[in-house]
Curated annotation (Swiss-Prot):
This is Membrane-bound lytic murein transglycosylase F. GO terms for biological process: cell wall macromolecule catabolic process; cell wall organization; peptidoglycan catabolic process. It comes from the Bacteria. It comes from Cellvibrio japonicus (strain Ueda107) (Pseudomonas fluorescens subsp. cellulosa). InterPro entries: Lysozyme-like_dom_sf (IPR023346), MltF (IPR023703), Solute-binding_3/MltF_N (IPR001638), Transglyc_AS (IPR000189), Transglycosylase_SLT_dom_1 (IPR008258). Residues 30-273 are annotated as: Non-LT domain. Residues 1-29 form the signal peptide. The gene is mltF. The keyword Signal applies. In the N-terminal section; belongs to the bacterial solute-binding protein 3 family. The keyword Coiled coil does not apply. It is an enzyme of class 4 (lyase).
Length: 495
């Protein structure tokens, strides 16, 4: 084969072309490498969503099982949807929080933020997760105000440096005779407590805060809204890179569509306590603080031994005796848990007026009532049916379940059983029952009352946790990093 010789100029031309090609390829590679990942890609790569928030009742706090709270649950759900951990840092000062988000020190901010209080910052807000209004509350001993004009010459508390102060500034121009007293470094719960105790006549608080704390402060009554609904939403740094913002928008749309948002909102804010009047709630709250503590350790110990909820056991004790060790009824039951002679003997209780024996006997008996129910009955139905049995005996409960089935209801569902149980006080029904007559309305009321007292006890317990969380948060440095989700197990909203 003949090999043609290349001229020197041709060789130089080829070398030059190859050099140019190498430079082009190198430049292209450098260009590709120099394109930074977007914010969402950065979050996914780091495995962590960094959020700045404010430690408090409606945002996040340390519960018995780790971090929890309304906004925490939403944030945890968002982080889970991305497959990353959630890291929350606490910042008590809203202005500092907004500034930190604006400066991209965090991926996002979540602390009951409204556009009104954030208008001085360059931020983008996602779809709102809640609408709130600013509401006037008043002490119950006063007449109910019906409009702003009724507050002429009165002093109204507000939180300093909040959306309220901006709203008040506008109201003062329209109503110059109003007197507003700003409270520095306070929280909604502080204003509500001051009104409840009579230390203040009026205050302006957010509607979600009122809903959350209303049963703890029954003397603070709701008057009217003083603002239009304001949307609460997550805040993001304003940027052309909307990757994480868009992901949040999709997540918020999803949880609204599938009902998850409504579910978590109900869990944290809807605390319906039916048939407990304001007076009864106040008496109960007083006794919870002044009478119950002496039995608290025994209740918790007995509940642990018999695998019960101590708050439920305490609620039973209150319904039975108002936590009085020497209580006695006209039917002969006595003691803190109001045991009959036969029940006390079966539970190994020698002295029904011995509060420790009574508590342990009551706990053992309630556990027995729970265990006697068919395994297929679970959840609230199991609890409620066991409570009815505790009150009237397992035999009467079985009669009620048989009657319920005969009447076309479901004997495993408390809502059906409670409907037919009162019929067993009528001869046409109890004459056919194995265990005869029963005061059929009593177990229904018993269950309702116990469940209501249980809600109040659980609510007060949560309030203690919230208050500890709030003030422990304030005692920390102004910017305190909370644990990440590697260990914390809070309210989970996974999609």
């Amino acid at each position: 084969m003949e090999i043609r010789k290349l001229s020197l100029s041709t060789i130089r031309s080829i070398i030059t072309s190859l050099s140019v090609l190498v430079l082009v390829i190198s430049a292209s590679a450098t260009l590709v490498r120099s394109t930074p990942p977007n914010v969402l890609e950065q979050v996914l790569a780091s495995g962590e969503l960094r959020v700045i928030s404010t430690n408090g009742a409606t945002t996040f706090y340390e519960g018995s099982d780790g971090l929890t709270g309304f906004e925490y649950s939403l944030l945890k759900g968002f982080a889970d949807s991305l497959g990353v951990n959630l890291a929350i840092e606490n910042q008590a000062d809203t202005r500092e929080l907004l500034h930190a988000v604006e400066q991209r020190q965090y991926h996002m901010g979540s602390a009951e933020l409204t556009a009104l209080e954030s208008q001085d910052y360059h931020l983008s807000f996602a779809k709102p997760y809640m609408q709130i209004t600013q509401q006037l509350v008043y002490n119950h001993r006063l007449g109910t105000p019906t409009s702003i004009k009724d507050l002429k010459g009165k002093e109204v508390l507000i939180l300093a440096d909040s959306a309220h102060s901006k709203r008040v500034a506008r109201l003062q121009k329209k109503f110059p005779n109003l007197t507003w007293r700003p409270i520095e470094n306070g929280q909604m719960i502080d204003l509500l407590e001051m009104v409840h105790k009579g230390e203040a006549d009026y205050a302006v608080i957010d509607s979600n805060a009122y809903e959350l704390h209303r049963y703890s402060y029954p003397r603070a009554k709701l008057a009217f809204d003083i603002s239009n609904p304001q949307p609460l939403a997550w805040a993001f740094p304003h940027s052309k890179d909307t990757s994480l913002f868009d992901a949040a928008q999709r997540y918020m749309a999803q949880i609204k569509r599938d009902g998850s948002l409504a579910q978590v909102t109900k869990h944290f804010f809807e605390r319906h306590i039916d048939e407990v009047t304001t007076g009864e709630a106040m008496v109960f709250a007083y006794r919870l603080q002044n009478r119950f503590p002496q039995w608290s350790d025994a209740m918790k110990s007995a509940a642990t031994e018999f695998d019960l909820d101590w708050q439920m056991l305490a609620a039973i004790g209150y319904q039975e005796s108002h936590w009085l060790a020497d209580a006695e009824s006209h039917t002969g039951v006595r003691g803190l848990m109001m045991l009959t002679k036969r029940t006390a003997r079966a539970m190994g209780v020698n002295n029904r007026e011995d509060p420790l024996q009574s508590i342990y006997g009551g706990a053992k008996y309630f556990r027995m009532m729970l265990d006697r129910l068919p395994e297929r009955i679970q959840g609230d139905d199991r609890l409620n049916l066991a409570l009815a049995a505790y009150n009237q005996g397992a035999g009467h409960l079985e009669d009620a379940r048989v009657l319920t089935q005969r009447m076309g209801g479901n004997p495993d569902k408390w809502e059906d059983v409670r409907k037919y149980m009162p019929l067993l006080s009528k001869s046409q029904y109890y004459s056919r029952a194995k265990h005869g007559y029963m005061r059929g309305w009593e177990p229904v009321q018993f269950v309702d009352n116990v469940r209501n007292y249980h809600k109040i006890i659980a609510w007060h317990e949560q309030q203690n946790e919230l208050r500890l969380a709030s003030y422990s948060g304030g005692a920390l440095s102004s910017l305190h990093k909370a644990p990440t989700e590697t260990a914390a197990q809070g309210e989970n909203l996974s999609l």
